[in-house]
Design a protein with these regions (language model features):
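Generic helix-packing signal
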Residues: 13, 54-58, 106, 110, ...
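Glycine-rich phosphate-binding loops that contact phosphosugars or nucleotide phosphates
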Residues: 31-176, 205, 240, 252-297, ...
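Generic C-terminus detector
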Residues: 298-339
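Conserved phosphate/anionic-ligand binding catalytic regions in large, soluble enzymes, centered on
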Residues: 1, 48-53, 212-221, 308-310
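Hydrophobic membrane-spanning alpha-helices of multi-pass integral membrane proteins
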Residues: 247-255, 307-308, 312
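Active-site phosphate/pyrophosphate-binding segments
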Residues: 3-4, 9, 13-35, 130-248, ...
């Protein structure tokens, strides 16, 4: 897991250098079809990449977007009318039968079906009308890290090209990612601080909400913590009552609208005397228990790739601090097949 976390800037560079022609061709087909609605289908970590892309579609394309429950097709036999729908599947392995079947049904029902996977030879890549390779390379860690951020970048480039952009804002990411990863020793110290926690909350808004969800999943997978993710808005609608000084809160507070929307949430957490550790913009972290400052000037559409890096490191170091092995989480397999 440690090696694959460290590899991510190289993975992004490879995708930017070698994957953009295929992505541009896929984007051209999407633009030609001019879909009126976008649906995403995914599981696990890839579901968080899909949620990030849902925000991209709704904010930058001005189209309605949603996340599909594959069971509506695979278990209940639903056959929705998907004409004028862009139906994007996201999967590291491309091997889960429910995703494959849902894409097959979506094609039959009239949707354009791109798939983003890290396995060009997978059943999902074959079932989809268009395949985009995330080019993350073999991922051996059960807890996905580099494939997740590669999916984020592939989805950003695809959707940015589909609306006529060039995606050049992503060119700086490899260097910025290396800069963020250099704070690993600070993250190790944070892990020591929280090693006895039994429960933890993660929170963010907008593009950072998927980051909060992915961070919670990584902590559950590797450290066996009961980690709950909430959008900053939803946290205030009830779950705030569960926060006390013994429940650490990991808050993602980047520059931009999403980070600004988190400021009232931080104020309410302070009222609860919460132990809040932040990842994001320097001004927002000043009054917290601690934090990792991210590079400034990064578009909020791309901040998700940088935000998750220290949180992946935290999951790694927290697992080790608690006596576990993050490379061999109990009860989990690299490829999970569901119907």
């Amino acid at each position: 897991m440690a090696a694959e976390i460290a590899e991510q800037p190289q993975v992004w560079r490879r995708l930017l250098d070698e994957g953009t022609d295929a992505i541009a061709a896929a984007a051209a087909r999407i633009a030609e079809r001019a879909p009126r609605f976008v649906l995403f289908v995914a599981r696990g970590t890839s579901d968080h990449a899909a949620l990030y892309a849902k925000y991209l579609v709704e904010i930058t394309h001005g189209l309605p977007a949603g996340l599909v429950s594959p069971s509506t097709m695979t278990v209940y036999g639903a056959r929705p009318d998907l004409r004028d729908v862009l139906y994007i599947a996201v999967s590291q392995s491309g091997g889960s039968p429910d995703l494959v079947q849902s894409v097959e049904v979506a094609r039959q029902q009239g949707a354009l079906t791109p798939a983003v996977t890290n396995n060009a030879g997978s059943a999902l890549a074959t079932a989809a009308e268009i395949h985009i390779d995330a080019l993350a390379g073999a991922e051996r860690s059960v807890a996905a890290t580099k494939s997740y951020t590669a999916e984020l970048l592939a989805l950003y480039l695809l959707l940015e090209r589909a609306r006529g952009g060039d995606g050049r804002a992503a060119d700086a990411l490899p260097d910025l990612g290396a800069q963020v990863l250099a704070s690993g020793e600070l993250v190790r110290n944070v892990a020591q601080r929280y090693r006895f926690a039994q429960r933890l909350i993660t929170t963010g808004r907008g593009y950072s909400y998927p980051t909060a969800r992915e961070a919670a999943l990584k902590l559950m997978e590797t450290s066996y913590l009961s980690a709950q993710a909430f959008s900053g808005a939803d946290l205030l609608h009830g779950p705030l009552a569960t926060v006390d000084p013994q429940v650490p809160v990991l808050a993602v507070v980047p520059e931009g609208a999403g980070g600004d929307a988190m400021l009232p949430v931080l104020a309410r957490l302070a009222d609860r005397n919460a132990d809040v550790f932040g990842v994001g913009a320097a001004p927002a972290l000043e009054n917290l228990a601690g934090g990792i400052t991210l590079p400034s000037g990064v578009p909020d559409t791309l901040s998700s790739l940088l935000e998750i890096l220290p949180l992946q490191q935290l999951a790694l170091h927290l697992a080790i601090a608690r006596g576990g092995d993050p490379d061999k989480p109990r009860g989990l397999r690299k490829v999970t097949e569901t119907l």
